[in-house]
Each structure stands twice: as structure tokens, then as C-alpha cells.
Amino acid sequence: MPPRPRFDRRAPVRELPNINERINYPQLRVVDADGTQLGVIDREKALEVAQERELDLVLVSEKADPPVCRIMDYGKYKFEQEKKAKEAKKKSHQTEVKEVKMRYKIDQHDYDVRIGQAQRFLKAGDKVKCTVIFRGREIQHTALAETLLRRMAKDLEEPAEIQQPPKREGRNMIMFLTPRKTPLVKKDDKEEPATRAVRTITAPPRPTSARLASKPAGNG
């Protein structure tokens, strides 16, 4: 009986970057940290220049002849590259339409569950289709379904805004919510400080010495 194949459970070996002593090419075209072309120089000389500047020698184009290296702060460069990759991934997120279904007669617990689902979808950048399903004669209660959907929109007004208000679609009533692009400004936040100051009660002025002097003296 042939032996069973063994699976290598070890983590994959991470490819180390070609920097400093790990660069094995004898001749390099070197670009300084400020973009100045240092020309084609020996590997040892390039490493010496990088060490003098307390920076790293980084291989940026291995296929060139000779290979191109740049003198830079590799730690800072790596951080910026990872940041750019995260931003690009975030921008490439494909917006999906997630659906939250319910009946117009829904209890509080189930309603809270639907709110939580919608919040997660909106946080991920997806649109939410809120659907109230009618069965049989329930179709006559469209007004109650619309009230329920508008209540949901109100409870989700911070992370979302209405893209399409409640409307009848076959035997369902639907509403579309989309992630809010700008922060919600509440009425209290709109009030200017000067407007609030008008509401303060101003104390009456205290009598001055001039007013006291003009008061007629008593006959006593």
C-alpha cells in the first residue's frame, strides 16, 4: 500500500525585500533620496552612500540593465505602500444591494434584528433594500407597511439616507437606503451660538453713582 501523502502545514516563506546587503548585483544605477541621479556605481559604493545618509538601498527595478536602486527610508516607504494598497482596496469595493425582509406585524425583537442587519450592510458600504412582505389579505394594510418602513428609515438616519421612499411593488412594499455620504446634522446642531445667546436672561443694570446723586433728597 503506497504511503499517504503528507501535507506541509508550515506557513509559506515570506519573500524578503531586496534591500541593502540582500542586493547581489555588482553594478547598480542609483537614485538618491532627493531624486538626484548618482549614475552607475559599484554595489559596495552604493551601500556606503546609503549608510552615510542613514538610509536604505532599495532595489526598485530588477529587470533594468543595470538594475535600478533608490536610497530611501525603507520603513517609511513600506508604510506608505501598504496605506496606498488599503485605500485602493477600499475604493475598489463593489457596492451590493442587501435585502432586509419583514412582515408588517413584526415584534420589537425581530425589528431590532433587522435594524442590526441593515446597520452592518450600510457600514460595509452596501445599499439596503427594505422589504415588507404581504400574504393573502394583508395587502390591504399597505399604510401600516409604509409607516413601518418610514420608522426604519428614521431609526437608521445616522448611517443612511433614503434613496427611494416606500412604494408598492407587486405584493411587497419596498424602500431603498444608501450609506450617508455626509454626517447627519440635527436641529440642535444647526442653531448658532448667537441665537442661543438671545435666549439668556439679561440682568437689569445696577444703579450708578450718577443716578443716585440725581435722586431728590428727602425732607427729613
UniProtKB/Swiss-Prot annotation:
Compartment(s) of residence: Cytoplasm
Assigned GO CC terms: cytosol; membrane
Q: In this record, what's one Pfam family? A: IF3_N
Q: Where is this region: Disordered?
A: 182-220
Q: Which Gene Ontology MF annotations are present?
A: ribosome binding; translation initiation factor activity
Which InterPro entries did the record assign?
T_IF-3_C_sf, T_IF-3_N_sf, Translation_initiation_fac3_CS, Translation_initiation_fac_3, Translation_initiation_fac_3_C, Translation_initiation_fac_3_N
Tell me which UniProt keywords the record has, alphabetically.
Cytoplasm, Initiation factor, Protein biosynthesis
For biological process, the GO terms are:
ribosome disassembly
Task: Keyword check for Protein biosynthesis, yes or no.
Answer: yes
* Keyword check for Cytoplasm: yes
Q: Where is the composition biased (Basic and acidic residues)?
A: 185-194
Domain of life (superkingdom):
Bacteria
Transmembrane residues, as ranges?
none
Family membership noted in the UniProt record? Belongs to the IF-3 family.
Q: Which HAMAP family match?
A: IF_3 (MF_00080)
**Stored NCBIfam families:** infC
Purpose: IF-3 binds to the 30S ribosomal subunit and shifts the equilibrium between 70S ribosomes and their 50S and 30S subunits in favor of the free subunits, thus enhancing the availability of 30S subunits on which protein synthesis initiation begins.
Q: How does it assemble?
A: Monomer.
Protein name, UniProt field? Translation initiation factor IF-3
Q: To which species is this protein native? A: Synechococcus sp. (strain WH7803)
Q: Which gene encodes it?
A: infC
